[in-house]
């Protein structure tokens, strides 16, 4: 659009393409509700005021007009549906822009995976921007499927204007110790005036200062107000996260006040489709924040203009002249139930349903089988007893953090076995990319599983397969079924597969609809409950067991990882440990 074309409409000399009458505008600049008409020309807002002529006129009868919602940080792969299906899921909930870090598929398929996300969403009515994965692999403590070097990034950034910056820099020891490759990636992007996203849970003081000196300007890993206050005070945009497992919204809402609100944004990070369909997306965060006493306009700002300004999306996040005509209509601001969604001035969703067709193109990459590993056998899972206590990974259903427990193991015939009565189950991390078996065995506490075994190919960040179980035989059945499917989620018991969800796209995403995936996830959860599982979303919890950049104790295919000290530790710790 040429500037000269919109000016006559803005001046009221020509009719608008779309005129919204009797609107109550949520003005994220003034912090006020403004009653006016809105004139729209092509894909832009031309003006706000007493406009009276439009080729199409919609009388809102006092309904609220809110900028299209923005998710400040997420991994589309965590929705377990294709990028197009993800768009079809979040658009009716008012999300018109997402800032995606595709480091999940990048760890499996490299830049080919990133390009797949970009190409598959061309022409889709969702503003999908990319933060180029910074940490592929995330650490040198596991095997993954690809590497992305600074040289790989140079041409990619020039080729794809949707790249906004560098994705979450997870291996903070590399940064504060001056790792040349990590710093070179930051230098490349910052000299192109791109943003650098952070990932630095629990780090404070001088190490935090050093990390921020590397031009890293955001963090989504805060789990308490004090941590968030320090990072905000040191210049970071705080991305408050509310996903399927990592739910920090309630804990961090007290952070928000009239002095610091511009530096707080909302994001989902990792959210399953059943949670999006049942709860909502960014709209859920707004509703919850308002319910907990946050001013409605402040909540809307965290989901719109704050994020747009941080990421230099200069024509997004507000209802104002010259801004993109991406907006949602809500009848009641406090309840924040979205009745209509407009993208580029076109009505695309009404009352939670799409009113347009969004076609999905098939891509050859969707057929690539990324599993090279052979089947496993029960003997591969054996752990000989040394007469010593062992380290156990303690997981929590509502957090991605883990703790290291030190416990006496249960033994049988000279081997350590799962102890259902004490909720100490065997866990294995198995390299999917290795043609020869490469795996590590550990033990996990906190799932409550009483029978059977569970396996998944979703395992941040390398996405090797993990399997936990009450017995080795069912672990073998579950793991081998995942291998045969080329990725997916599996529950087995008594030697049989009870439920499964194939994930053929990079072993991360399904080719089914969100509704079908949600239904299958619901069935998986039902089966898990029947087997005694106490974790709300075991597959999401299990997906973080291998994440060797978030404290405290993790497992990768190479061994148990002490994340604090960034090194491997033995399963055994001696009788006095």
Curated annotation (Swiss-Prot):
Species in which this protein is naturally found: Kosmotoga olearia (strain ATCC BAA-1733 / DSM 21960 / TBF 19.5.1)
Family stated for the protein in its record: Belongs to the metallo-dependent hydrolases superfamily. Adenine deaminase family.
One GO term (biological process): adenine catabolic process
PANTHER family hit by this protein: ADENINE DEAMINASE, N-ACETYLGLUCOSAMINE-6-PHOSPHATE DEACETYLASE
NCBIfam families per the UniProt record, alphabetical: ade
Keyword Protease: no
SUPFAM superfamilies: Composite domain of metallo-dependent hydrolases, Metallo-dependent hydrolases
Protein name listed in UniProt: Adenine deaminase
Known cofactor(s): Mn(2+)
